[in-house]
């Protein structure tokens, strides 16, 4: 069995920038209020003609071009999203068609903001067993389409975007590199803390569900905050323990970009410095499943990761779910 490694990454975000000042004109809020509580300054918003699959394809094409892998060489496409183009077919199948990846199986997975890490875990297992060689994992969201723009507690938080990674097996002599440790978890008993109540088989769309705004994101921010700070620390330490490492061994820590206060509290608990922590949420807000792959792509583009670095990807989200992935670069 061989480890999987990330061959290349790519990202796509909409051109439209929606600032805190723009939000001041819509709801009772202010730039200082949003910044002090979240760290977010702006977010990208997809137009009415842009769906999750469109951003996914754009990010995927960039990652494929960097990797040198042709779409026809892909064996699998995984799209992590809570905002698919439609209930079915899957967004991954739409991406497969648009890329021309006719040899790839394709499916979506839903683990909210942890989705990209779940996708990496699945892909790494298929590659490790030599049943699949090249796998495309995408985290992609158009959360602006399910945000209540009259709710100041949630509309300030979310943005749209997509990040993609092409995975393949490590080469001879690289056996100690690649995706070397994971920890994943879930607690469905806390599902109501972060949800989109209607639109599924439990509450199909009706005039009543639309008028009562049950198709928008609902969140208990205080409880999610407490959960996030604890679970970021727990999942990071579990993944490190599996490979006999500590937080001191981490060269770059890339957390889910949800809230600056969450990141600060979690990294303080872990003893990870600001210098080792990558943050870009000020530019994008919370992009759910796209958050971590977009951050990873930007960290690579900014030359913040060098050979043999230990990189930690750590996420949490609706479900509730959480996860961590350690990569020896």
Swiss-Prot record:
Pathway the protein takes part in: Lipid metabolism; fatty acid biosynthesis
Biological process annotations from GO: fatty acid biosynthetic process
What InterPro entries does this protein's entry cite?
Answer: ACP_syn_III_C, ACP_syn_III_N, FabH, Thiolase-like
UniProt-annotated stretches for the region ACP-binding: 257-261
| Swiss-Prot/TrEMBL domain comment | The last Arg residue of the ACP-binding site is essential for the weak association between ACP/AcpP and FabH.
Cellular component GO terms, alphabetically? cytoplasm
> Of which family is this protein a member?
Belongs to the thiolase-like superfamily. FabH family.
EC code(s) of this entry: 2.3.1.180
The molecular function terms of the Gene Ontology recorded here are:
3-oxoacyl-[acyl-carrier-protein] synthase activity; beta-ketoacyl-acyl-carrier-protein synthase III activity
Q: What is its main location?
A: cytoplasm
Please verify whether the record's keywords include S-adenosyl-L-methionine. Answer: no
Q: What is this protein called?
A: Beta-ketoacyl-[acyl-carrier-protein] synthase III
């Amino acid at each position: 069995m061989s480890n999987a490694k990330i061959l290349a990454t790519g990202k796509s975000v909409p051109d439209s920038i929606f600032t805190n000042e723009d939000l001041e004109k819509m709801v009772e809020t202010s730039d200082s209020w949003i910044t002090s509580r979240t760290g977010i300054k702006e977010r990208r918003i997809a137009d009415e003609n842009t769906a999750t699959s469109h951003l996914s394809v754009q990010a995927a094409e960039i990652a494929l071009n960097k990797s040198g892998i042709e779409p026809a060489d892909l064996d699998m496409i995984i799209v992590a999203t809570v905002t698919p183009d439609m209930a079915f077919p899957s967004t991954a199948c739409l991406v497969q068609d648009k890329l021309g990846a006719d040899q790839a199986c394709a499916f979506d997975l839903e683990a909210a903001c942890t989705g990209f890490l779940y996708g990496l875990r699945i892909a790494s297992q298929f590659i490790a067993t030599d049943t699949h060689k090249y796998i495309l994992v995408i985290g992609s969201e158009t959360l602006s389409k399910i945000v209540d723009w009259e709710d100041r507690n949630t509309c300030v938080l979310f943005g749209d975007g997509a990040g993609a990674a092409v995975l393949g097996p490590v080469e001879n002599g690289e056996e100690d590199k690649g995706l070397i440790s994971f920890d994943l978890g879930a607690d469905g008993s806390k599902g109501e803390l972060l949800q989109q109540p209607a639109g599924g088989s439990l509450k199909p769309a009706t005039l009543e569900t639309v008028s009562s705004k049950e198709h928008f994101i609902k969140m208990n921010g205080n409880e999610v905050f407490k959960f996030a700070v604890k679970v970021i620390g727990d999942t990071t330490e579990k993944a490190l323990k599996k490979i006999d490492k500590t937080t001191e061994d981490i060269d770059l820590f890339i957390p889910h970009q949800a809230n600056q206060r969450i990141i600060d509290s979690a990294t303080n608990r872990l003893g990870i410095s600001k210098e080792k922590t990558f943050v870009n949420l000020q530019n994008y807000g919370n992009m759910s499943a796209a958050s971590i792959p977009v951050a990873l792509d930007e960290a690579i583009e900014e030359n913040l990761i060098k050979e043999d670095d230990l990189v930690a990807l750590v996420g949490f989200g609706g479900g509730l779910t959480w996860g961590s992935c350690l990569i020896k670069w």
